[in-house]
Amino acid sequence: MATDAALRRLLRLHRTEIAVAVDSAFPLLHALADHDVVPEDKFQETLHLKEKEGCPQAFHALLSWLLTQDSTAILDFWRVLFKDYNLERYGRLQPILDSFPKDVDLSQPRKGRKPPAVPKALVPPPRLPTKRKASEEARAAAPAALTPRGTASPGSQLKAKPPKKPESSAEQQRLPLGNGIQTMSASVQRAVAMSSGDVPGARGAVEGILIQQVFESGGSKKCIQVGGEFYTPSKFEDSGSGKNKARSSSGPKPLVRAKGAQGAAPGGGEARLGQQGSVPAPLALPSDPQLHQKNEDECAVCRDGGELICCDGCPRAFHLACLSPPLREIPSGTWRCSSCLQATVQEVQPRAEEPRPQEPPVETPLPPGLRSAGEEVRGPPGEPLAGMDTTLVYKHLPAPPSAAPLPGLDSSALHPLLCVGPEGQQNLAPGARCGVCGDGTDVLRCTHCAAAFHWRCHFPAGTSRPGTGLRCRSCSGDVTPAPVEGVLAPSPARLAPGPAKDDTASHEPALHRDDLESLLSEHTFDGILQWAIQSMARPAAPFPS
């Protein structure tokens, strides 16, 4: 009773120090609730008070309430308070523990909480040391079967082994035996360290034993023993959720591919467990590969080992970074490389890459006046529809396989478009030559097609030379008016050449500076370039006789 009074007095003495030292409710408050020191209603009340006034005030109120409880609750509080995780979390509790009286023992049993007495008739009798399970007897009898005379050694009879779970003996009895060879005595056991996440229900590090069991057929079957459970590759595949493909390149490819922690066994072998999950395994399609397909141990791209992802359609394996595009994480379910996907597409659609037959041109009737300039020059000749005028047919042609390059243009041919003098006569570009004599001296520029020419070469009969609006021989018979503001001049090739008329009557107004500036501002350079190409694509007119 003196100890109970001392613990209560120490709690009242260090109440404020403990409240200040505890700066968070976890893990102390939760541990008190787990050990039934604080009831659920008081636990929730302390959490609400912590949110309102802070953690120190909430714990001070909790300790004040604890002083009103019995001595057993106070003793349990001190035990929980001085646990290792609380001392690590709350550093200010260490001085309180150091100043704790040495004569106060916190390890004394609880009072008033003794377990109920069990009648002696219900207590099971102690197990006799000579009573063993069938698995232990099989292991003890194994040396007797392998001795030359078949007599059991006395040491094997006296050696007792720890009991194992009944499941282990049942599993061993299912395994076939033959020719007096005991399963467990002839097995080769190799210890492999595995993580607890690889085996369902395991906590902490477990020890797996890779057992190669010998059967009468001379073959072998690999399984992993964890505690008393034996896991075969079929068990891993049934219990595992997803199909894991990441693996290490050392050693042969195992029956089970796992992505979890891997431990190399002595002798170069590996033990791999299927990773457990909640998603059910996908059903195997007829085209899916075998589950025991052997993949390569090196990347098919860089020919290096390491963490690889295995293709389900071929034996190749790849690094995630070597794929194109690279993957950041291992995809779930069935995964195939690009070669397998391409082969599958070719099988489903063998003629997908064949060129489609060219469709005949579709002819659409249009009212007069809506045909674009130069349409007859660009479009190939075709048969018109029956009973329809050829001038009212607009042909929709399919796109050609490849666009033909534009004809090369001399920069001097386009330069006069941007160099118009103040008098309306275009300035001469360096290197401009007459198309008849080839001389570049005193050449003129046609105001319609911008071609360089000599007046004497194009008009040798002595036709009078006008002051403005000079045109070459080809454009002198063109009745199309010169381009005005906002309108591009149509191609002269569409119009049939007519007889020469009076210069004053046949010549249209020249392209003045204001018209050209308006044309450049309202139309793109592509339109001007197209107009220049159409103007220069006409054949030269014959010389007058």
UniProtKB/Swiss-Prot annotation:
Ranges of residues in domain HSR: 1-105
Motif LXXLL motif 3: where in chain: 414-418
Biological source species: Homo sapiens
GO cellular component labels: cytoplasm; female germ cell nucleus; male germ cell nucleus; nuclear body; nucleus
Record's keyword annotation contains Kinase: no
Biased composition (Pro residues): 116-128, 358-368
Protein name from the UniProt record: Autoimmune regulator
Residue ranges of every copy of the SAND domain listed in the record: 181-280
